[in-house]
Design a protein with these regions (language model features):
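Intrinsically disordered terminal tails
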Residues: 1-73, 79, 134-145, 183-202, ...
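Physicochemical signature of membrane-embedded alpha-helices that form the seven-helix bundle of GPCRs
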Residues: 30-40, 106, 110-126, 130, ...
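Helix-to-loop junction signature of class
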Residues: 48-56, 131, 162-183
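A surface-exposed beta-alpha-beta supersecondary segment
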Residues: 52-111
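Transmembrane alpha-helix/helix-exit interface in multi-pass inner-membrane proteins
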Residues: 78, 121, 168-171
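Juxtamembrane/interfacial segments around transmembrane helices
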Residues: 81-96, 160-167, 201-216
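Peri-membrane helix termini and adjoining interfacial loops of integral membrane proteins
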Residues: 88-93, 134, 175-186
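Alpha-helical membrane-embedding segments
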Residues: 89-103, 177, 213-225
Length: 233
């Protein structure tokens, strides 16, 4: 009777463990969607950092510089002059770094925040890959001191926060018509006649939203409260 009772207990535990695995894998499928969303968010974040169209300056000041459009980015400024007939000759770009004195605080801080956002996003992807691997292999425990789902969610939300600060600060600078004292060799005036939001800011906004959404999905992952994940036989 004792052996039969033990065998029955073992069978029940195995069924319970199998049910737990099915539940966890089903729940993890939502996290796979979150992983896809986070991947797109990271890609858009990297693209926005490299784009130059953060601020669109429309210049019509013949006495100071040739008329045209200046695209002000985080790492360079590109000027498109209207008086050139050849498009390839109309574009002139100048690179700058964090150490250039003429850069305003918003661009300096934005450079660091965008770099931090990309690093946090990559770390978040690494954690979610580890978390999904553990779930599908059935080795993730409810009482883990460092839950990779939670870690990934926090990292993605932090990355979203960094990008959001950059977006809001640059949007404020555009709306308040703040200028930049570029070197005279750039032939760009301190302020344009018209300043508008560029496509890079829109891409960054979408990246921030996707990273926030993926982080929320990762944090929503829960374990079954009434199932023991690793029963001892």
């Amino acid at each position: 009777i004792s052996h039969a009772h033990n065998a029955l207990i073992c069978l029940q535990l195995k069924h319970t463990y199998a049910a737990a695995m099915v539940w966890l894998v089903s729940s993890a499928n939502r996290q796979v969607a979150g992983f896809a969303i986070a991947t797109i968010g990271c890609i858009l974040s990297g693209i926005s950092m490299g784009l130059v169209e953060w601020r669109m300056w429309y210049i019509n000041q013949p006495l100071l510089s040739p008329s045209g459009v200046a695209c002000v980015g985080m790492w360079r400024v590109c000027i498109y002059h209207h008086h050139y007939s050849n498009i390839s000759n109309a574009k002139v770009c100048y690179r700058y770094t964090y150490h250039d004195d003429f850069l305003p605080p918003d661009i300096r801080v934005s450079q660091h925040l965008l770099l931090a956002a990309n690093i946090l996003g990559l770390l978040g992807k690494a954690f979610i890959i580890l978390a999904l691997r553990n779930v599908y292999m059935g080795i993730l425990q409810k009482d883990d001191t460092c839950n990779p789902f939670v870690a990934s969610g926090i990292l993605n939300i932090a990355a979203s926060g960094c990008i959001s600060i950059v977006v809001l600060w640059n949007y404020y600078s555009i709306m308040s018509m703040e200028g930049i004292e570029f070197p005279s060799s750039f032939r760009v005036p301190f302020k344009p006649d018209v300043q508008e939001v560029g496509s890079a800011l829109i891409v960054a906004t979408l990246a921030a939203f996707l990273l926030l959404l993926s982080g929320t999905i990762f944090l929503s992952y829960t374990f079954p409260l009434d199932i023991q994940m690793h029963p001892e036989v």
